Amino acid sequence: MSCPNYCSGNSNSGSLRTSRHIPLTSIDLCPTSVSCGDVLYLPTSSQDHTWVTDNCQETCGEPTSCQPVHCETGNLETSCGSSTAYYVPRPCQGSSFLPASFFSSSCLPVSCRPQRYVSSGCRPLRPLLNSYQPIGDCVPNAYRPQFCLSKSCQPQNLLTSGCQPSSCLAYRPQSLHVVSSSLRPLGPLFSGCQPLTHVFSTCRPSCSGL
């Protein structure tokens, strides 16, 4: 089975993924004499002519890991300087991610090439935790992801299997110094007013000479 649409070039194929600078004049666009599984040199950028070596020796049948996760017709790019485009794995930005696998040499139509690399092809260097691990007495609703993934390598759907509380968000009632209804004030109020000095209820005139 041959791949009718793909690009190739000449370069050493030692590692799984190699960047090469190849002049456009030496690129043979989309020949039909190479079968699936052969080494391809796919462009990562049409500006600097950097090509990616795809040494993924896979069968002609496109495996699950080589299928685009999501195809958006409005989010396309064209490579090889022609009207033919290819699904090229994009490297994950950031030091904590590596490509999990490369796509086979089978070519995919332009309608199935996302503009940005999808995180399903990326795996963290340190595996995510498979369960929630509370730190202290935390309520379940207070869990948050331990770290954020790079914006250039975001998953299609939110991942919830690798969460860890970044801080304890305990929903405990805080004391507002509320006075209980059974407490009395320090200075109880009297039901009536009492003068500081005694006032006689009757007045007696002083003696005066008549």
Swiss-Prot record:
Keywords: Keratin, Repeat. Transmembrane segments: none annotated. InterPro entries: Keratin_matx, KRTAP_PMG. The keyword Repeat applies. GO terms for molecular function: structural molecule activity. Localized high up in the well differentiated portion of the hair follicle cuticle (about 10-15 cell layers above the apex of the dermal papilla). Coiled coil: none annotated. It comes from the Eukaryota. It holds the Pfam family PMG. One of its GO terms (cellular component) is cytosol. Interacts with hair keratins. Belongs to the PMG family. In the hair cortex, hair keratin intermediate filaments are embedded in an interfilamentous matrix, consisting of hair keratin-associated proteins (KRTAP), which are essential for the formation of a rigid and resistant hair shaft through their extensive disulfide bond cross-linking with abundant cysteine residues of hair keratins. The matrix proteins include the high-sulfur and high-glycine-tyrosine keratins. This is Keratin-associated protein 26-1. It comes from Homo sapiens. The gene is KRTAP26-1.
